[in-house]
Amino acid sequence: LLVFKKDKEFSMHFHLLKDEAWYISKGQFLYKFIDTKTATIKEMIVSVGDCIHLIPGQPHQMLALTEGATIFEVSTQHFDSDSYRVIPGSSQLDNFNNLPF
């Protein structure tokens, strides 16, 4: 389970090996993905009951629109070396903003 605070998002990223399926079990998200055929960012609101299938190579990102928004993820095995960040998410930006310079 992936549980989000409102207005937090993970980085826009993709995997070359991992195949993912998400089920939205609570709340709402803004689902962002890059259409690799047109090189444009697409967005859609997803909510309880929606399912998303992410094939390898598909850049994706979620922004929680509600507190406690939850994703149930089923996927092939995850390898840290198989995550390729395209755009930073909340945690990367928070860490950057807290640097001492």
Predicted regions and their residues:
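A short glycine-rich, His/Asp/Glu-containing loop-to-beta-strand
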Residues: 1-12, 18
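Glycine- and acidic-residue-biased ligand/ion/polar-headgroup-sensing regions
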Residues: 6, 17-36
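Short beta-strand His + acidic residue motifs that chelate non-heme Fe in jelly-roll/DSBH
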Residues: 11-13, 31-33, 54, 60-65, ...
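Short glycine/proline-enriched turns and hinge-like loops at secondary-structure junctions
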Residues: 14-16, 23-24, 64-67
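Short, surface-exposed beta-strand-loop junctions and turns on beta-sheet-rich folds
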Residues: 18, 37-39, 77-79
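Short acidic-glycine-tyrosine-enriched beta hairpin
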Residues: 35-57
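Double-stranded beta-helix
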Residues: 44, 61-101
